[in-house]
C-alpha cells in the first residue's frame, strides 16, 4: 500500500489531557477510518512517523445525541486507535512549538 493511502487511513491525532498523560507511557491516540484494522493502522503509523509500533488497540466510539436549534441529531460514529510504541520511540505532535 502506498503512503498516500496511509495518510487517508489516519484521520487525526487526539490531543487531550488524558491522551497527553498516556504519551508518558509511550501510548498515542488517533481517530482512524471506520474500516481500519489493527495491522493496517500499525503499518500506517510506522510508515508516516518512522517509529516502531509494539501494540495497537482499537475501539469504536458511538456518536452522541445532540440538539441544535431545537432539532435532535446524532454525531457521527468514530473509530479510535491507541498505539503503543517501543521503548526508545516517540511522536512529537508539537513539532518545535514554544
From Swiss-Prot:
What Pfam families has UniProt attached to this entry? Ribosomal_L23 (PF00276)
Write the record's keywords in alphabetical order, separated by commas.
Answer: Ribonucleoprotein, Ribosomal protein, RNA-binding, rRNA-binding
Q: Which PANTHER family match?
A: 60S RIBOSOMAL PROTEIN L23A
Q: Which family does it belong to?
A: Belongs to the universal ribosomal protein uL23 family.
Q: Which NCBIfam families match?
A: PRK05738.1-3, PRK05738.2-4
Task performed by this protein: One of the early assembly proteins it binds 23S rRNA. One of the proteins that surrounds the polypeptide exit tunnel on the outside of the ribosome. Forms the main docking site for trigger factor binding to the ribosome.
Name under which the protein is recorded: Large ribosomal subunit protein uL23
Tell me which species this is from. Rickettsia canadensis (strain McKiel)
Q: Which gene encodes it?
A: rplW
Amino acid at each position: 500500500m502506498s503512503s498516500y493511502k496511509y495518510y487517508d487511513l489516519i484521520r487525526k491525532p487526539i490531543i487531550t489531557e488524558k491522551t497527553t498523560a498516556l504519551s508518558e507511557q509511550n501510548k498515542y491516540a488517533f481517530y482512524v477510518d471506520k474500516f481500519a484494522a489493527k495491522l493496517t493502522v500499525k503499518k500506517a503509523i510506522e510508515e508516516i512517523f518512522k517509529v516502531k509500533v509494539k501494540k495497537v488497540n482499537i475501539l469504536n466510539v458511538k456518536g452522541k445525541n445532540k440538539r441544535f436549534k431545537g432539532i435532535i441529531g446524532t454525531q457521527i460514529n468514530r473509530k479510535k486507535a491507541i498505539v503503543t510504541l517501543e521503548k526508545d520511540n516517540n511522536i512529537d505532535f508539537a513539532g518545535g512549538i514554544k
